[in-house]
Amino acid sequence: MKVIDMAVHEVATITADKTICDCARQMRLEHVGSLVVVNDDQTPLGMITDRDIAIEVVARNLDPMKLTVRDVMTTPVVTAGPSESMVVALARMREFGVRRLPIVDEEGKLVGVISNSNLVEELSSLLDSLVRTFAPRRLEKSPFALTNDVPVEHHRR
């Protein structure tokens, strides 16, 4: 499955010149924990999360009215292409230690975002489908297989 198929397409964004106060306010209004930092033509420049604000601003007792998103955002931004597989996206997230990947088109414009939770939900759904498809067949072949709901001692009798 391609990442674009499981992406969120209405992405919460912010520009780098906004204050951290503006950023936190926007996160609150949009009920999100992260924003993709973009320039005027919607090219991603970085990411900023509520965790970044807590650790880099609040914990250091800095003034959120004086700092800009540019001062705190994570750069460079790690992205994915729309046709990449979820396996490739997961590998990239792991390699770079990120939980979200903005998805950009061939021109570098933002077209969506995918998070590790999106990928885990999709993988979980796929695994569930596989189990529902193949587990009954396996039980037909081996009806005496161990099950989790019966203690091993009962299987030995």
Annotated model-derived regions:
Residues 1-10, 49-79, 85-94, 115-157:
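Tandem CBS (Bateman) regulatory domains
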Residues 1-3, 17-20, 32-36, 52-56:
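Short acidic/polar alpha-helix capping motifs at helix-coil junctions
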Residues 8, 17, 33, 110, ...:
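Low-complexity, intrinsically disordered short peptide segments enriched in small/polar/basic residues
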Residues 9-13, 43-44, 79, 109:
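Short, flexible active-site loop motifs that bind/organize anionic cofactors or intermediates
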Residues 13-31, 38, 80-97, 104, ...:
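The conserved cystathionine-beta-synthase
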Residues 15, 43-45, 61-64:
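A generic short alpha-helical patch detector that favors 3-5-residue windows
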Residues 27-30, 35-51, 93, 101-118:
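A glycine-centered beta-loop-beta connector
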